[in-house]
């Protein structure tokens, strides 16, 4: 069974989201996603400064088995990307919740209401 930390929010597309003290959202892929994909060999992340809408494909994660889009969980502006993750994408396999992919600042009027909690995500992947 996959690890699903209770302090994070999730999407149906297997991204995790952590709200930081300054209100930005840190985004990564879940343990379930990395486990399903297998050995991750490449990450393509969005550009800093890019405006995105909730549900937009903003990046790609490639493994030896498959490639999958990474989606923005909310509407906003990408304010940081984890260059270390692109340099060593295999680290996501070892620590899916420790290796973040990008950070986003919510757009005015945007919300996190569509994100699901750990219980709902656990049911989704069971």
Swiss-Prot record:
Q: Which cofactor does it need?
A: (R)-lipoate
> Which Gene3D superfamilies does this entry report, sorted A to Z?
2.40.50.100
Q: Which PROSITE patterns match?
A: BIOTINYL_LIPOYL (PS50968), LIPOYL (PS00189)
Task: Determine the domain of life of the protein's source.
Answer: Bacteria
Q: Which SUPFAM superfamilies match?
A: Single hybrid motif
Q: Where is the Lipoyl-binding domain?
A: 24-105
- What positions are modified (N6-lipoyllysine)? 65
GO CC terms for this protein?
A: cytosol; glycine cleavage complex
Cofactor info, note text: Binds 1 lipoyl cofactor covalently.
Keyword DNA-binding among record annotations: no
Q: Which UniProt keywords apply?
A: Lipoyl
Example GO biological process: glycine decarboxylation via glycine cleavage system
Assembly and partners are described as:
The glycine cleavage system is composed of four proteins: P, T, L and H.
NCBIfam families on file: gcvH, PRK01202.1
Q: Which family does it belong to?
A: Belongs to the GcvH family.
Q: What does this protein do?
A: The glycine cleavage system catalyzes the degradation of glycine. The H protein shuttles the methylamine group of glycine from the P protein to the T protein.
Protein name per UniProt = Glycine cleavage system H protein
The taxonomic lineage of its organism, from the top, reads:
Bacteria, Pseudomonadati, Pseudomonadota, Betaproteobacteria, Burkholderiales
What is the name of the gene encoding this protein? gcvH
């Amino acid at each position: 069974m996959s690890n699903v930390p209770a302090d994070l929010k999730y999407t149906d597309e297997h991204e995790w989201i952590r709200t930081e003290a300054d209100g930005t959202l840190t985004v990564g892929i879940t343990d379930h996603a990395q486990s399903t994909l297998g050995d991750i060999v490449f990450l393509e992340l969005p550009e800093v400064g890019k405006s995105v809408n909730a549900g937009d494909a903003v990046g790609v994660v490639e493994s030896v088995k498959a490639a999958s889009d990474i989606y923005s969980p909310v509407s906003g502006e990408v304010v940081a990307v984890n260059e270390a993750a692109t340099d060593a994408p295999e680290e996501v396999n070892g620590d899916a919740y420790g290796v973040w992919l990008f950070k986003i600042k919510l757009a005015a009027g945007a919300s996190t209401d569509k994100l699901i909690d750990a219980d709902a995500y656990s049911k989704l992947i069971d």
